[in-house]
Amino acid sequence: MSKREETGLATSAGLIRYMDETFSKIRVKPEHVIGVTVAFVIIEAILTYGRFL
């Protein structure tokens, strides 16, 4: 007998099944995104208003 791959519901035809997608090798923690954003805002504020501080 041949092995059959489970295809899911017939109503989901054409939709992406995210569990079958490959995962990215680049992992970024949410803390790093927040840290880079805060650093960017601080650097931008210093460059913009630095002469007034």
UniProtKB/Swiss-Prot annotation:
Entry protein name: Preprotein translocase subunit SecG
Pfam families membership: Sec61_beta (PF03911)
GO cellular component, one term: plasma membrane
InterPro entries attached to this UniProt entry: Preprot_translocase_SecG, SecG/Sec61-beta/Sbh
Cytoplasmic topological domain: 1-30
Highest taxon above the source species: Archaea
Family per similarity comment: Belongs to the SEC61-beta family.
Localization of this protein: Cell membrane
Primary localisation category: membrane
Transmembrane portions of the chain: 31-49
Keyword Protein transport on entry: yes
Keywords noted in UniProt: Cell membrane, Membrane, Protein transport, Translocation, Transmembrane, Transmembrane helix, Transport
Gene that this polypeptide is encoded by: secG
Keyword Transmembrane: yes
Segments on the Extracellular face: 50-53
Protein's job: Subunit of the protein translocation channel SecYEG. The function of the beta subunit is unknown, but it may be involved in stabilization of the trimeric complex.
Subunit architecture: Component of the Sec protein translocase complex. Heterotrimer consisting of alpha (SecY), beta (SecG) and gamma (SecE) subunits. The heterotrimers can form oligomers, although 1 heterotrimer is thought to be able to translocate proteins. Interacts with the ribosome. May interact with SecDF, and other proteins may be involved.
GO BP of this protein: protein transport
Membrane topology, from the record: Single-pass membrane protein
